[in-house]
Regions:
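N-terminal hydrophobic/helix-forming segments and targeting peptides
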Residues: 1-236
Length: 236
């Protein structure tokens, strides 16, 4: 399971550019489902037919996209001005390593400010000036927190893309191991969740399941200073 998780975590796939991770998932699940399609929005929809005629349809959904930044401008010194794609905390972004789909790497830094806001952030990609930066990145390009995946202790893993690639890996493994079911299983690996749950909404209307379950990460209550919700890592 750990190797599968690492494989799914690796692709750079911000909201709207999920194709790299969709390709990995398609390869993993193809032998275990009856049909696979990619809809117009980019959702990867995998169907495992039920054994009963007119069987109940159950949709299981996990999103493939990752929060990130979109380049909004390039300074004369070569620094990239950015804004958020999805929910990002400016203060938690400082000094974070980011990756662009074309392989360019950068670091998020900020203007000197008492209260860091998104408008204060920029990305340093090591460019000498604006012209140099434009050979590597263009306005409108998107980057994500780099896949710095590593193990914590014996059985825990940390990575910026665990939301929601952990659920993608779980759904993949479910399809690989579930066997025959009375119900028809519709597994949706959805796009653009971080910018408004767009993919899951489209897939839900298109497939009209009888029941739906979203698989995602959530807040926690087992670290210093937190009490709610009553959720602990490793306890289900």
């Amino acid at each position: 399971m750990l190797e599968l998780l690492k494989k799914v975590l690796k692709p750079v796939a911000p909201s709207g550019l999920e194709e790299p991770v969709a390709a990995v998932i398609r390869e993993e699940v193809a032998p275990y489902v009856d049909s696979i399609e990619t809809d117009a929005l980019g959702n990867l929809i995998c169907v495992k037919n039920g054994t009963e005629a007119n069987s109940e349809k159950i949709m299981l959904s996990a999103h493939m996209d990752h929060i990130g930044y979109i380049v909004t401008g390039i300074e004369k010194e070569g620094f990239l001005r950015v804004t958020n794609v999805g929910g990002i905390s400016p203060t938690m972004s400082l000094t974070r390593h980011v990756s662009f789909p074309n392989g360019v790497q950068g670091v998020v830094v900020s203007e000197v400010s008492k209260d860091t806001a998104m408008k204060d952030l920029f990305v340093d990609i090591g460019a000498q000036d604006k012209a140099d930066a434009e050979t590597m990145v263009q306005i409108g390009d998107v980057c994500v927190y780099a896949n710095d995946c590593f193990q914590l202790g014996a059985n825990r893993v940390a990575s910026p893309a665990m939301d929601d690639r952990a659920a993608c890996a779980l759904l993949i493994r479910f399809l690989q191991t579930v066997g025959a079911t009375k119900q028809t299983i519709i597994a949706v690996f959805s796009v653009q969740e971080e910018v408004g749950c767009r993919g899951a909404k489209v897939a839900s209307f298109a497939k009209a399941p009888d029941k739906g379950i979203a698989i995602d990460v959530t807040a926690w209550g087992d670290t210093p200073g937190t009490k709610q919700p009553d959720i602990k890592l490793g306890e289900g």
